[in-house]
């Protein structure tokens, strides 16, 4: 039973097994069919060793053969770059062992040798190095010897501590192990003296089998040797071939060059490499650049970690670099780091030398560089184990490579720059050639306005001529003429103005210039093609170019530019007669049917001299081709022989002439060329010789040399005349024409600018565009800061502001202008009789120059670029110049002057000869706020905002944001930026210099003071004094001529009146009877009785003859009577008198006129030319005061609010937001710093002057609150110990004290700061600065006392009888004189100086007085000297120490224009009253100087009364000045540079002479209460008393609208 059970069980098992086998068989069949692997077979795990062998490219790179260009070392040719086939993996395992050997040098500086041995036959490579060996000791953790650990076990290394900064090549712990794994045999030998053992062990079969380590005792020198046999099968190689050996050899050389202090032996031989520089020679040896010169290598050892060599590359960018001895063949960040520096410097040089070429980008510069770099970098990183590309960021390099300027300079001279420039030229030429067609087309399209010749581009193309005309109108003329000669062989193309000077144009300009490209296309020219032979000429569409331009100087310039265009690109064409010109008459003279044509003005002038009866000829001027009619055009072309002038090439002198005229390199030669021309012209004029001219009747051809030297030079000279002003009047011709027209029109009402422009073109023969003329008019009227110091035209409308530098002017159609009242005072009408007027088109136009009373070229500056010369002169202060003129009239030398711009509040300091620093104004308001209240001259507000503040606010790619916000509070005349920044950044900015950070300093260089002198010759002036002296001599001589003219004219007038009076008296007495007598008898009777023929007419005719004026033909005969022939006696002036002349009143009037005229003549004879000049100056200064006072009033217009009655009847003025536009009174002024360079310039300047005491001290800034009195006579502004203002009690900031808010107003040397004198600075603080720098040993005193006033008032007004009818007006002249005198006396001397004056410590001994009283008290010489010296200062912002004490108190700091006519009604003792300007002017004497001066009271009295006073008390004292003594413009002056606390500037503080300080009284309209002033200046709550201040704040009540110049400084 059991058995059977068992048997059954066996059977069942058998069945199951069979079934399983069957199923397995089926499954197996299925698997075979689908080849499906098991999960275990799909997902496998390998050991790291297996993985390395299976995927070697992850570790050592590809194990496939690779063919590429590599630098290798071949025994026969040395280092060379060739195509090699190698296995990167094999190369890498060799390199790993090699780099390990080099790394040992970083561990042991005593290592000196590496031996490399390669045996290709036995496939054995050995690398040995001395130096510290591997420690032969057992690793306590891994329990194996260290050499076995690091060479036989993966992921072992000594480089895993990243906190340790290492400069080795090993990093990941793979290198040597990889070599072991890919070797059939790998043996390590090392000896360690420290552990006194040597170690040797061998691994085989790809590091799978290891022999026993052999450890022996050792006491020799340390070494390490690795010997291995690469598993060539793994690299699909059979043996070490030539290519891989050459590559390994190069690596041995690499080591020799990159491993400093290590000699490398290769196969037993020492490699001949001595350092990195020697290694580089292996590459560049015997290599030449494109010019055949050996490559020049620039080498610099920047530091111990960076060694750089640089040379020219002709194969694009190349680099050989090593990082810790690893050859980074693909470069990396270290290469970029060095190359970027080099490229940055080179591109600067290239751009300088390639301004006109193709723009060059950095990568293009890089393509010409070959750089060699050997560097040590801490813990470098790479993008793969192959270590070909270093990826570490430069900030982690552990060192910096700062290449020297010497290196960069050498780099720019080693051929790289030249190579880049050659490439640029090649690229430019390639681009230009694309513009040309190499195919000759008979028809071309796409060129508008071309009338092509029918035969152009065909077989007769060489016989075709292209006529290039000046504009469309000239084309019409040419087309009219083609009707005569036909269209088959002539084409016409109009030019749009002047073409480009291709010789100096940039590549971009040439590429984009449509005119040039069109000419090339029409003619069929090709760049770089030489047209030397007939065959090349046949490729052209036209065989000639005919130039047809106007016969004026601009037409000559167009001809010259076309000649230059052809000569520069295709010089050979000039030799083939390719160019010719078509000339037309410039003047035609016709008489009956006879007609003469003249082709040059000199030829016409010569004809006029020899022709009789010129008036019989009709003269017509042809200013352009458009003047000719179509009929005349046909006549011209019909006589082609006469009108076509061929250009002939005469030889090298032609090439030289063309180059001279148009090459940028010939600037100096052009100057000499033009100078010689001007001198020759001057000599010709002196000797009466005719001008040279080219186009005579026989002229058929012309050489290029003659064209350049006789025709084109006229344009160059006229270009200078149009661009460079005259020294005499400071005008360019266009400006002179405008003034001439305005004088001639003598408008009493304003006129539209556009209408005036048309009038100028009509009256003065202006031949250029009206738009330019209108801009000239606008510029003459502008008066914003940086434009004119004296605008000769009035800006009635929007003529532009400092916001946009005048570009915001309204259209000329909408704005009006008229002559300024100063114009005729600067250019007296009487001088017009002495001028030489020019003629244009037979029309009398403007004079050669006007002769102003002061050099206007200095007042308003000048700027212009001509041919060969350029001119640049800054503005100077008019009053300073007047002062210097007066000094010169008195026989003294003029004071030096600094540039000065009207209403500019910044500073201008001299740095050297004609070099100045111009600084704006900036104040620190609090810890995070600065306030910019002035910009450098001609830095326009909007431009500054966009180019400086916006980038500072938003930051740029290179610089982070510096400021956090800014606000604008400007007006059209003032600047105010309130800038917010963090406290830290403000501190940093202040440390660096706020002026520098905010770009508030510019330099002004005036080394091009080139002007036309009175002879019409260009002359360069070295100093402003030279200009002034030359002007002075000329002007003084003209005053002599004026006197002669006036004596003659007035004498003739006197004789005329005398004869008339005598005739009337004799008639009344019955001695003469005229009734019923013939005219002939009357004339004979008058002759017999000794009456003279019209003396005025006779004198005029004598003048004309004496002057030998060429325009006599233009003078019509004034003889309108038949009393006699023109040559006979003329008694019309007697016989034409009316019967009214016989009345008693008229007789008395006539006798009075006669006597008055006689006195005028006698007075004039007694005066010297100097006296006449002084009279003119006095009148000018007087009017200047009025004009500037009016300007201030206009600026303040509308700023006052309406008075509103309060509860107690006190008018309260609606407070306006003025404070936001005014500088903060709490700011700390920052003094501009002089840079080291500027300071050096200053020192040189002072040394040059050899310690001359008169030498001004160059100061960067003049402290506003500078209250010390400059030491008199030193020229330096020094604080003297006696300056009581600094030490005395400080008055409280007076609330709402108009006019005392001072912008930085430097004081002038030699002037007390405290006195609030008649502050005459219309210009601005910088004027005072300039003057203070100018001061010499004597303080300059402006003679503006009452004597001067009287001189101005009594300035005679001469009247002349220019017509018979003038007799009746003679009486009016005297009346006018009286009125004028009254006017002058009555008009107060208004203070135009907006700037506050610095408080004065005291009055100079010759303080300037406007009254004779003070003058008398002053010694004559002292008075004279000082007056002269400080004349400019009187009118400049500095306070005037030269005024009398009384006068000094006359003017409020800023309200001076009209404040002076009112007297303070409060807080003044009677003794404090100050005479007004009016009184001084009328009476000529102020209160005695000895009048007791009120002492400064401990407290100011009646403050409240004064403020509340609504009475007319302010008018109680007849027109006395309102400014209390000591309250100068500086009274409320802002603190400068924080040198003293805000109370230090003591407006009320007077030196010992002035013991009292009167409260400043401002005269304002009752409607404008002091509240209109910013609270900054008037702190609402009364200021707390400060130490030393004894007075309470004074509130002022405004009395008059006129007096609103509250605080004029804030507007200027």
Swiss-Prot record:
Pfam entry (one): DTHCT
Region Interaction with DNA, annotated ranges: 351-353, 999-1008
UniProt KW keywords: Acetylation, ATP-binding, DNA-binding, Isomerase, Isopeptide bond, Magnesium, Metal-binding, Nucleotide-binding, Nucleus, Phosphoprotein, Topoisomerase, Ubl conjugation
Entry note: cofactor: Binds two Mg(2+) per subunit. The magnesium ions form salt bridges with both the protein and the DNA. Can also accept other divalent metal cations, such as Mn(2+) or Ca(2+).
Function (record text): Key decatenating enzyme that alters DNA topology by binding to two double-stranded DNA molecules, generating a double-stranded break in one of the strands, passing the intact strand through the broken strand, and religating the broken strand.
Boundaries of every Toprim domain copy: 464-581
Subunit structure: Homodimer. Interacts with PLSCR1 and KIAA1210.
Residues modified as Phosphoserine: 1224, 1324, 1328, 1330, 1332, 1346, 1363, 1387, 1400, 1411, 1428, 1439, 1441, 1448, 1453, 1460, 1509, 1511, 1513, 1537, 1539, 1563, 1568, 1600
Subcellular location: Nucleus, Nucleolus; Nucleus, Nucleoplasm; Nucleus
Top EC class for this record: isomerase
Reactions catalysed according to its record: ATP-dependent breakage, passage and rejoining of double-stranded DNA
Something else known: Eukaryotic topoisomerase I and II can relax both negative and positive supercoils, whereas prokaryotic enzymes relax only negative supercoils.
Residues annotated as catalytic: 814
Acidic residues biased stretches: 1362-1379
Residues under site feature: Important for DNA bending: 865
Origin: domain of life: Eukaryota
GO CC annotations, alphabetized: nucleolus; nucleoplasm; nucleus
Signal sequence residues: none
Residues bound to Mg(2+) 2: 550, 552
Name this polypeptide is given: DNA topoisomerase 2-beta
Cofactor(s) in the UniProt record: Mg(2+); Mn(2+); Ca(2+)
Residues recorded as bearing Phosphothreonine in the entry: 1280, 1390, 1562
Gene Ontology molecular function: ATP binding; DNA binding; DNA topoisomerase activity; DNA topoisomerase type II (double strand cut, ATP-hydrolyzing) activity; metal ion binding; ribonucleoprotein complex binding
Regions of compositional bias (Basic and acidic residues) in chain numbering: 1322-1332, 1346-1358, 1417-1429, 1443-1453
């Amino acid at each position: 039973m059991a058995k059977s059970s068992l048997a059954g069980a066996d059977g069942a098992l058998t069945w199951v097994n069979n079934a399983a086998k069957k199923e397995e068989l089926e499954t197996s069949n299925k698997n075979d069919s689908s080849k499906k692997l098991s999960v275990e077979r799909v997902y496998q795990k390998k050991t790291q060793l297996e993985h390395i062998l299976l995927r070697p490219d992850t570790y050592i790179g590809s194990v496939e053969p690779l063919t590429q260009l590599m630098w290798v070392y071949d025994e026969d040719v040395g280092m060379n770059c060739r195509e090699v086939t190698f296995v990167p993996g094999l190369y890498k395992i060799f390199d790993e062992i090699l780099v390990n050997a080099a790394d040992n040098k970083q561990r042991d500086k005593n290592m000196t040798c590496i031996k490399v041995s390669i045996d290709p036959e036995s496939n054995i490579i050995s690398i040995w190095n001395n130096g510290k060996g591997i420690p032969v000791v057992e690793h306590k953790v891994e329990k194996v010897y260290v050499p076995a650990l690091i060479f036989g076990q993966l992921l072992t290394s000594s480089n895993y501590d990243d906190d340790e900064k290492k400069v080795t090549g090993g990093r990941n712990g793979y290198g040597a192990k990889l070599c072991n794994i890919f070797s059939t045999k790998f043996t390590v030998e090392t000896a360690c003296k420290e552990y006194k053992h040597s170690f040797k062990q061998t691994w085989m079969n790809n590091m799978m089998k290891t022999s026993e380590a052999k450890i022996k005792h050792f006491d020799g020198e340390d070494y390490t040797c690795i010997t291995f046999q690469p598993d060539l099968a793994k690299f699909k190689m059979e043996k070490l071939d030539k290519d891989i050996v050459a590559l390994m050899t190069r690596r041995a050389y690499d080591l020799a060059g990159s491993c400093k202090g290590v000699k490398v032996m290769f196969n037993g031989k020492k490699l001949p490499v001595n350092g990195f520089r020697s290694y580089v020679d292996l590459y560049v040896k015997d290599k030449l650049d494109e010019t055949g010169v050996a490559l020049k290598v620039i080498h610099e050892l920047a530091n111990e970690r960076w060694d750089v060599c640089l040379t020219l590359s002709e194969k694009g960018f190349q680099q050989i670099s090593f990082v810790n001895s690893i050859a980074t063949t693909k470069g990396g960040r270290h290469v970029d780091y060095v190359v970027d520096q080099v490229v940055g410097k080179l591109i600067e040089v290239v751009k300088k030398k390639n301004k006109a070429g193709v723009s060059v980008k950095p990568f293009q510069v890089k393509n010409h560089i070959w750089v060699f770099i050997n560097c040590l970098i801490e813990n470098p990183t790479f993008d793969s184990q192959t270590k070909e590309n270093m990826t570490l960021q430069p900030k982690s390099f552990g060192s910096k490579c700062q290449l020297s300027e010497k290196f960069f300079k050498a780099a720019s001279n080693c051929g790289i720059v030249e190579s880049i420039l050659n490439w640029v030229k090649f690229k430019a030429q390639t681009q230009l050639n694309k513009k040309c067609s190499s195919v000759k087309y008979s028809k071309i399209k796409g060129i508008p306005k071309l009338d092509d010749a029918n035969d152009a581009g065909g077989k007769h193309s060489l016989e075709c001529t292209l006529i290039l005309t000046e504009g469309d109108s000239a084309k019409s003329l040419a087309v009219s003429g083609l009707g005569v000669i036909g269209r088959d062989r002539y084409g016409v193309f109009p030019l749009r103005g002047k073409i480009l000077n291709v010789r100096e144009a940039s590549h971009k300009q040439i590429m984009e210039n449509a005119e040039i490209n069109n000419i090339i296309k029409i003619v069929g020219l090709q760049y770089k093609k030489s047209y030397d032979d007939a065959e090349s000429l046949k490729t052209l569409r036209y065989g000639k170019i005919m130039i047809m331009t106007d016969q004026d100087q601009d037409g000559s310039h167009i001809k010259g530019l076309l000649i230059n265009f052809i000569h520069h690109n295709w010089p050979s064409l000039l030799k083939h007669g390719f160019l010719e010109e078509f000339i037309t008459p410039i003047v035609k003279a016709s008489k009956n049917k006879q007609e003469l044509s003249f082709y040059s003005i000199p030829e016409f002038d010569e004809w006029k001299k020899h022709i009789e009866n010129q008036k019989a000829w009709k003269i017509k001027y042809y200013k352009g081709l458009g003047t000719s009619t179509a009929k005349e055009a046909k006549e011209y072309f019909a006589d082609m022989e006469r009108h076509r002038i061929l250009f002939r090439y005469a030889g090298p002198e032609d090439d030289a002439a063309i180059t001279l005229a148009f090459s940028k390199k010939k600037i100096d030669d052009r100057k000499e060329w033009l100078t010689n021309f001007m001198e020759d012209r001057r000599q010709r004029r002196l000797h009466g010789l005719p001008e040279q001219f080219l186009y005579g009747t026989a002229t058929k051809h012309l050489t290029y040399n003659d064209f350049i030297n006789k025709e084109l030079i006229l344009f160059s000279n006229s270009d200078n005349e149009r661009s460079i002003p005259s020294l005499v009047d400071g005008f360019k011709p266009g400006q002179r024409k405008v003034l001439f027209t305005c004088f001639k029109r003598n408008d009493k009402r304003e006129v539209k600018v556009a209408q005036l422009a048309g009038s100028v073109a009509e009256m003065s023969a202006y031949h250029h565009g009206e738009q330019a003329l209108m801009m000239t008019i606008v510029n003459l009227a502008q008066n914003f800061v940086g434009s004119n110091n004296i605008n000769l035209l009035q800006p009635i409308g929007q003529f532009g502001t400092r916001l946009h530098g005048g570009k915001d002017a309204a259209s000329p159609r909408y704005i009006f202008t008229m002559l300024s009242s100063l114009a005729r005072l600067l250019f007296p009408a009487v001088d017009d009789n002495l001028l030489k007027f020019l003629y244009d088109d037979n029309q009398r136009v403007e004079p050669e120059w006007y002769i102003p009373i002061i050099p206007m070229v200095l007042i308003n500056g000048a700027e212009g670029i001509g041919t060969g010369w350029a001119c640049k002169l800054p503005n100077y202060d008019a009053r300073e110049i007047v002062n210097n003129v007066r000094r010169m009239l008195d026989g003294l030398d003029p004071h030096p002057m600094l540039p000065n711009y009207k209403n500019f509040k910044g500073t201008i300091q001299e740095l050297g000869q004609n070099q100045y620093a111009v600084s704006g104004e900036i104040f620190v308001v609090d810890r995070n706020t600065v306030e910019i209240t002035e910009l450098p001259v001609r830095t326009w507000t909007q431009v500054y905002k966009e180019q400086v503040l916006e980038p500072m606010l938003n930051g740029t790619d290179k610089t982070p944001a510096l400021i956090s916000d800014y606000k604008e509070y400007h007006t059209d005349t003032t600047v105010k930026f309130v800038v917010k920044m963090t406290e830290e950044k403000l501190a940093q900015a202040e440390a660096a210099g706020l002026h520098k950070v905010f770009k508030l300093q510019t330099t002004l260089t005036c080394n091009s003071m080139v002007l036309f002198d009175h002879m019409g010759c260009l002359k360069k002036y070295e100093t402003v004094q030279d200009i002034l002296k030359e002007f002075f001599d000329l002007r003084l001589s003209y005053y002599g001529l004026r006197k002669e003219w006036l004596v003659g004219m007035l004498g003739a007038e006197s004789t005329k009146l005398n004869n008339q009076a005598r005739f009337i008296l004799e008639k009344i007495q019955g001695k003469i009877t005229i009734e019923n007598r013939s005219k002939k008898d009357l004339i004979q009777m008058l002759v017999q009785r000794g009456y003279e023929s019209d003396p005025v007419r006779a004198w005029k005719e004598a003048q004309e003859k004496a002057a030998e004026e060429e325009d006599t033909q233009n003078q019509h005969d004034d003889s309108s009577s038949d009393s006699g022939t023109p040559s006979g006696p003329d008694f019309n002036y007697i016989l034409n008198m009316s019967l009214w002349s016989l009345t008693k009143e008229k007789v008395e009037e006539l006798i009075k006129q006669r006597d008055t005229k006689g006195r005028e003549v006698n007075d004039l004879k007694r005066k010297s030319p100097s006296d006449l000049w002084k009279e003119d100056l006095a009148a000018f200064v007087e009017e200047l005061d009025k004009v500037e006072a009016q300007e201030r009033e206009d600026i303040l217009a509308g700023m006052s609010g309406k008075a509103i009655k309060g509860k107690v009847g006190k008018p309260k003025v609606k407070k306006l937001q003025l404070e936001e536009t005014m500088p903060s009174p709490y700011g700390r002024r920052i003094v501009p710093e002089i840079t080291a360079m500027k300071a050096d310039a200053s020192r040189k300047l002072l040394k040059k002057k050899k310690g001359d005491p008169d030498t001004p001290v160059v100061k960067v800034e003049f402290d506003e609150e500078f209250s010390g009195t400059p030491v008199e006579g030193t020229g330096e502004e020094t604080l003297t110990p006696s300056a009581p203002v600094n030490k005395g009690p400080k008055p409280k900031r007076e609330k709402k004290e108009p006019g005392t808010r001072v912008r930085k107003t430097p004081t002038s040397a030699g002037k007390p700061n405290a006195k609030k004198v008649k502050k005459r600075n219309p210009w601005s603080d910088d004027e005072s600065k300039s003057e203070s720098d100018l001061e010499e040993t004597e303080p300059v005193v402006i003679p503006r006392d009452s004597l001067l006033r009287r001189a101005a008032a009594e300035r005679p007004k001469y009247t002349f009888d220019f017509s018979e009818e003038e007799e009746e007006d003679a009486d009016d002249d005297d009346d006018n004189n009286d009125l004028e005198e009254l006017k002058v006396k009555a008009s107060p001397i208004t203070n135009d100086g907006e700037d506050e004056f610095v408080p004065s410590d005291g009055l100079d001994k010759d303080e300037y007085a406007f009254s004779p009283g003070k003058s008398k008290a002053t010694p004559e010489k002292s008075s004279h000297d000082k007056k002269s010296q400080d004349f400019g200062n009187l009118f400049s912002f500095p306070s005037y120490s030269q005024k009398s004490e009384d006068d000094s108190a006359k003017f409020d700091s800023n309200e001076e224009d009209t404040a002076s006519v009112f007297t303070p009604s409060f807080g003044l003792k009677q003794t404090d009253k100050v005479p007004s300007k009016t009184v001084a002017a009328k009476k000529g004497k102020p209160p005695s100087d000895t009048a007791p001066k009120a002492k400064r009271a401990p407290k100011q009295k009646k403050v409240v009364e004064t403020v509340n006073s609504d009475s007319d008390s302010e008018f109680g004292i007849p027109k006395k000045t309102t400014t209390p003594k000591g309250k100068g413009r500086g009274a409320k002056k802002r603190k400068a540079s924080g040198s003293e606390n805000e109370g230090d500037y003591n407006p009320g503080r007077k030196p010992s002479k002035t013991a009292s300080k009167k409260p400043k009284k401002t005269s304002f309209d009752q409607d404008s209460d002091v509240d209109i002033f910013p609270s900054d200046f008037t702190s609402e709550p009364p200021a707390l008393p400060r130490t030393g201040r004894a007075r309470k704040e004074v509130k002022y009540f405004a009395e008059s609208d006129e007096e609103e110049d509250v605080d004029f400084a804030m507007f200027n």
